Amino acid sequence: MTILEHEIMMTEQLRRVPADELQARLNKFRAVMDREFPGWEIAIVNHKVNMYYFAGTMQDGVLVIRPQDEILWVRRSYERACNESLLQDIRPMKSFRTLAEFYQPLPAKVYLENKTATLEWQQLLYKYLPFASEAGMDSVISELRLIKSPYELALMRKSGSIHRNVLDELAPRFIVQGVSEAELAVNLYAEMLRRGSHGVARFNLPLGEDVVGLASFGKSGLVKTAFDGPGGTGGTCVAVQSIGSAFRKLQAGRLVYLDIPCGVDGYHTDKTVVYYYGDLDQDPFSDKIRAAYEHCVFLEELTASLLQPGMVIENIYRQVMEQFDPQYENGFMNGGKFLGHSIGLVMDEAPALANGFKGKLEAGMVFAVEPKIALPGIGMVGTENTYLVTAGGAKSLTGKPQPLRCIL
């Protein structure tokens, strides 16, 4: 059953990453490795997201890439890997001993994912494969993942369509007197699942664990979390800094902050909406709330207008911040120093839209733009949408920022 416009092997039960897509990624990987590390001989991919990127499956095993070949070695589940991946060479492994017997003579240097490979994993690897030296290849993989292919963009457009439908169109019907933060978040999450969302939000950062996202009412949106993001929540408990409280019920006169992630077949979009429950005109802080929210809309639209090929990332940040109203300095991004971030297989892809990032934008990059302002004693306001960089400027995948809507 075809669901996306792109030609993908797709059924209701199983959607595989096309073989030509995987091969194109592997070819680009080899080209960048040749450029950055001339004479390289072997690279080992262990992280499940990178394995999915290159092999189209997430298993307990490793993908070994050499200039002349690539082999997916799987401990568990070999059968599932063979069903999901369209790589030509997939083999079972019991341990790294299997690889030690195959890769002889052993190259002197191996390239690994240093950002995610644990010391324990590396020690186990070196027990059977005693490479003389190692180096990181994280920058190579990040460079490849930054530019999205037509296949990847088809998935992100589908995710963005779900995101826009649920948060812009359906959310108001669930914002009712007495609903809890947790219940509202879960209801919206369920609506996304019903429409095809893959149901999790993956992050690079270790503290980024999320499934449902979060809903915050009023001042609970000001509670900072350990995760490096502007949105706040008290969480379900001390141990879980997301979703929202099952005991904080919605009352009139509260801001409703919704940051519920969405994704399709591994590819995410990011979107945040804010509603006001009640009659904003009767709120003593109505002018302050409206002004701060409208400034966030202005900042998002300004940032999006600068997302053009050739623009230097840090210059975008500086140009936008030149138009930033200093009265919001203490509450902007809840202390963060960025305007947004790249997004794709994880929510927090590099680079961020921030100072210090000197790379230039290219068509095919995708960024979430999320200006947000914390209003002490009131709550969090802001907007967020996901934008594709094209030759003709930025195109939103999740809709445009909407005026602050009141739910009466």
Where are these regions (language model features)?
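Active-site neighborhoods and metal-handling regions in enzymes and metal-associated proteins
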Residues: 1-408
